[in-house]
Swiss-Prot record:
Keywords on record: Cell projection, Coiled coil, Cytoplasm, Cytoskeleton, Deafness, Differentiation, Hearing, Non-syndromic deafness, Phosphoprotein, Repeat, Retinitis pigmentosa, Usher syndrome
Alphabetized SMART domains for the sequence: PDZ
Official protein name in the record: Harmonin
Stretches for region Disordered: 401-427
Protein source organism: Homo sapiens (Human)
Length: 552
């Protein structure tokens, strides 16, 4: 690096950055760039320290440190500040308004900046950009105006004259108490929620403008020739580039227009003055507009080839347009078919839901009727529950010949009979359940709470003949078996008895069901297809023998 360039760079860094830590960070970033040669990472890192408008000149100061092969890419990634003010006129009475939003003002300690543009609106159409600083409105400087004063100034005339310069940064400060910070426009989310780019609309001149730095120290020259444009297209243009020269290495091409060199505007310079400026320094910062005068240096053959190429491109675009229209038509047809299909599915689903609702209402109604009848006939159902035990109590085996010590003998004979009853009861208590069932695969430890949870598979033959009671909203707090009727499928299975808790029906957990919901679910599961019904029950714990004794 040229010592003079390095000295000027350090002087500018010391002038613009006061914080020593930020200075060290800047130098570290530059050292890492020269190791990795990743321009995009460099610019992203630089934006963390070049984070306010006053520091933007550092991007130009760093430009001489960038190799020639990266000059154009570096220029495209860094914010492009305006060289001069731009003036536009907007109609305040336009039906869609001015088409822009602004933020900032004296009370925020900064100027007024455009923060949002309505796409296709007035401001967008005249070339204003997000990140433009408004300098004058209707001829008045607004540097000492508050936000409200600026708004009032805009309302004074029907036609609003606005002068702006592009900065590429947006002030961020929600209230006067918060510190002022800045965001680059390519990182700023506007009020509409979209991220706006720091460059202007596609196709404008600034998109083709680029800035390069060339040091002539130790070289024979730029390696290019310049020419003045004709009357209808004035300006200074590159007419020849020597292969392998500095100009070729930095990316200059025939037809590029030179618009500025070292801060000197080339718009109105003649050929001799332009040559003198280019030869006046060994370090040149050149701003050009790519291919602005390319047609001035084309041969007839090149013009013919370009016209032919343009026609081919036009035909290709027409073909793409036709294909797009056909694809769009097909897409619309597919979308319409999909819409109709979804409509039919929704209609069928609604019909199915209505049918299911009516079925459920009918089931609940039948269950309520059945429950009422069952409650009226409760006593007889209790007799059906334990018929064998009752028989043992009502019809004991006749006693043998009475004896004086019949206090012992009468008890022995019925005891034999009761033993038989006990054997039968023991057969009823034998539970048939599915081996290998893991209750923790269906229920939480809190739901199980040490219960003996079993999976029963009952064959659907005849009626289930199983009655329930309780429910989540009852004092019991759960759904339990209140009766198992004789000759029903539940009784034939032998794995469920009165007092067992019903925890799941055909894989559906019912621990939080009301009685009506549980009965409806049980009825539906029984009436559905299939030969079996799966019930998960928590076995009723056995009662203590003392609970069954009555003392007189």
């Amino acid at each position: 690096m040229d010592r003079k360039v390095a000295r000027e760079f350090r002087h500018k860094v010391d002038f613009l950055i006061e914080n020593d830590a930020e200075k060290d960070y800047l130098y570290d970033v530059l050292r890492m760039y020269h190791q990795t040669m990743d321009v995009a990472v460099l610019v992203g890192d630089l934006k963390l320290v070049i984070n306010e408008p006053s520091r933007l000149p550092l991007f130009d100061a760093i430009r001489p440190l960038i190799p020639l092969k990266h000059q154009v890419e570096y220029d495209q990634l860094t914010p492009r500040r305006s060289r001069k003010l731009k003036e536009v006129r907007l109609d305040r009475l336009h039906p869609e308004g001015l088409g822009l939003s602004v933020r900032g003002g004296l009370e925020f300690g900064c100027g007024l900046f455009i923060s949002h543009l309505i796409k296709g609106g007035q401001a967008d159409s005249v070339g204003l950009q997000v990140g433009d600083e408004i300098v004058r409105i209707n001829g008045y400087s607004i540097s000492s105006c508050t936000h409200e004063e600026v708004i009032n100034l805009i309302r004074t005339k029907k036609t609003v004259s606005i002068k702006v310069r592009h900065i590429g940064l947006i002030p961020v400060k929600s209230s006067p108490d918060e510190p002022l910070t800045w965001q680059y426009v390519d990182q700023f989310v506007s009020e509409s929620g979209g991220v706006r780019g720091s460059l202007g609309s596609p196709g404008n001149r600034e998109n083709k403008e680029k800035k390069v730095f060339i040091s002539l120290v130790g070289s024979r020259g730029l390696g290019c020739s310049i020419s003045s444009g004709p009357i209808q297209k004035p300006g200074i243009f590159i007419s020849h580039v020597k292969p392998g020269s500095l100009s070729a290495e930095v990316g200059l091409e025939i037809g590029d227009q030179i618009v500025e060199v070292n801060g000197v505007d080339f718009s109105n310079l003649d050929h001799k003055e332009a040559v003198n400026v280019l030869k006046s320094s060994r370090s040149l910062t050149i701003s050009i507009v790519a291919a602005a005068g390319r047609e001035l240096f084309m041969t007839d053959r090149e013009r013919l080839a370009e016209a032919r190429q343009r026609e081919l491109q036009r035909q290709e675009l027409l073909m793409q347009k036709r294909l797009a229209m056909e694809s769009n038509k097909i897409l619309q047809e597919q979308q319409e078919m999909e819409r109709q299909r979804r409509k039919e599915i929704a209609q069928k689903a609604a019909e199915e839901n209505e049918r299911y609702r009516k079925e459920m209402e009918q089931i609940v109604e039948e269950e309520e009727k059945f429950k009422k009848q069952w409650e009226e006939d409760w006593g007889s159902k209790e007799q059906l529950l334990l018929p064998k035990t009752i028989t043992a109590e009502v019809h004991p085996v006749p006693l043998r010949k009475p004896k004086y010590d019949q206090g012992v003998e009468p008890e022995l004979e019925p005891a034999d009979d009761l033993d038989g009853g006990t054997e039968e009861q023991g057969e009823q208590d034998f539970r048939k359940y599915e081996e290998g069932f893991d209750p923790y695969s269906m229920f939480t430890p809190e739901q199980i709470m040490g219960k003996d949870v079993r999976l029963l598979r009952i064959k659907k033959e005849g009626s289930l003949d199983l009655a329930l009671e309780g429910g989540v909203d009852s004092p019991i707090g759960k759904v339990v078996v209140s009766a198992v009727y004789e000759r029903g499928a539940a009784e034939r299975h032998g794995g469920i008895v009165k007092g067992d808790e019903i925890m799941a029906i055909n894989g559906k957990i019912v621990t939080d069901y009301t009685l009506a919901e549980a009965e409806a679910a049980l009825q539906k599961a029984w009436n559905q297809g299939g030969d079996w019904i799966d019930l998960v029950v928590a076995v009723c714990p056995p009662k203590e023998y003392d609970d069954e004794l009555t003392f007189f």
